[in-house]
């Protein structure tokens, strides 16, 4: 029989805003074998549950708690029986399981991050079972579902590091007594893209294809045409262009959040060595760095 501390008393002057508990970074490699042709999904999954009762917090009564070890095991078993077609579908399966299996679970939130494996390919021929780690952006998702509602689905890209050596500048900004930054018409532009978007509720979505489309848009608007590039007057303008094109080309998308750090590369002064360095040798600086953020959504249609 479970024992808890009866001498604990509820404080009527304090109330919870939100509670949750779960298991983080549950790692799984799922292999789908179709004859000799194998497909893989490696993921790290974090699950948070909110219960209808707060007695575990207030009184130390654990009788409603689903152990976090059970949550870990559930992720493993669902991967076996449901597979992982997409990380978004897998996250929805986990939410649905806990909400349907336990009446006292009122909220499930699942974060899944996919390891970027890519199938070996040469001269258009794909290998049947060999993969290479290819970190050109990490695919992640967040799914939250309340007992009384549909799942709210976000997908995203992170750790997509890009750089261009020209077609970027920064001019016309405010200058005061503390400004030392010179205006520049031509500079390196490097960033590590983080973007997250929310889907319309209740729509059937090809999550994998949509993610590929958004990543292509990010690369396209950052780099521009392959033969000449595209000028960026600011990180803000590039961020906005990505959002506008994504919302235009992906009808399933409701809104989009982007964060772009401005990773600096500065020309190294070689004048003391009698050398002129014309932006050929640059010094990468990890910090400090600027960071530009923005969230854009579709405007509601006018009823007039």
Curated annotation (Swiss-Prot):
Localization terms from the record: Peroxisome
N6-acetyllysine sites (modified residues): 10, 23, 27, 36, 118, 122, 164, 175, 185, 221, 228, 278
Catalytic activity: urate + O2 + H2O = 5-hydroxyisourate + H2O2
Residues recorded as bearing N6-succinyllysine in the entry: 10, 23, 221, 228
The EC number(s) this enzyme carries: 1.7.3.3
Residues modified as Phosphotyrosine: 289
Short motif (Microbody targeting signal): ranges: 302-304
Active-site feature positions: 23 (charge relay system), 68 (charge relay system), 264 (charge relay system)
GO BP, sorted A to Z: purine nucleobase catabolic process; urate catabolic process
Keywords on record: Acetylation, Oxidoreductase, Peroxisome, Phosphoprotein, Purine metabolism
Modified residues (Phosphoserine): 39, 63, 232
GO cellular component: peroxisome
Predominant location category: other
Residues carrying N-acetylalanine: 2
Gene Ontology molecular function, alphabetical: urate oxidase activity
UniProt-annotated binding residues for urate: 68-69, 170, 187, 235-236, 262
This protein's pathway: Purine metabolism; urate degradation; (S)-allantoin from urate: step 1/3
Similarity annotation: Belongs to the uricase family.
Known role: Catalyzes the oxidation of uric acid to 5-hydroxyisourate, which is further processed to form (S)-allantoin.
Protein name: Uricase
Lineage start: Eukaryota, Metazoa, Chordata, Craniata, Vertebrata
Protein's gene: UOX
